[in-house]
Amino acid sequence: LQTGALDQWGNIAVGADLIRRLDGDIVHGLTTPLITTANGEKFGKSEGNAIWLDSTLCSPYKFYQFWLNSDDSVIGNYLRVFTEISREEIEDLEDSTIREPHKRRAQVALAKYMTQFVHGDSELQTALAVSAAVFGTADPRGLSPAAVSQMADTLPSAKLDTTGYDLAPNLVKVGLAKSNNEARRLIGDNAITVNGIGVKDPYAKLEMRDQLGGIGWLVRRGRKTLGFIRS
């Protein structure tokens, strides 16, 4: 018996026919439906959307975010395929997706389950801590060096411009401003935070003692635009 995804049916059929011709034996093939994205695309390296189990290729935080970003239209199928969550709970999560899609309860349940299953509870807690820091619901200064490293690897980043350690040119380097003047204007408008702390001085400098995990600084423009300046 040879098994494979639905797109391998042709190869399986050819193999079965070859064995029949060469040995006279009857063999069998079994295919399963492809697991696809909301756009109907399959997962894979060639499609550019592969998700890795190896933490050196995909950090637990990035792994967690992958599942958290699952589309509403496929979340029920993913829960049934990838988890051992009970039917009743899955149906409840699907109902929640319809009634309160903004809460993303189903996506959170899937992301937690998969991250804990693959990487363990400790890395799940790290992924949750990084998520809270990135989305502004927790103080990033409490992150461990390992958590900071995972966060830095998933954000736009730039090497520290050490010419005076001024914040403004570093905001330009990391893509949060187009020019030093714009960067200083944003700071003056209270639109910039460093490590979760608002900055008011347009000529503020980055202090080495304020680095997160000895790695660098988390900078944010507004609520959703982030970057990481590496020391």
Whereabouts are the PLM-identified features?
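NTP-dependent nucleotidyl-transfer catalytic core
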Residues: 1-8, 16, 23-28, 41
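Conserved nucleotide- and phosphate/pyrophosphate-binding catalytic cores
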Residues: 21-231
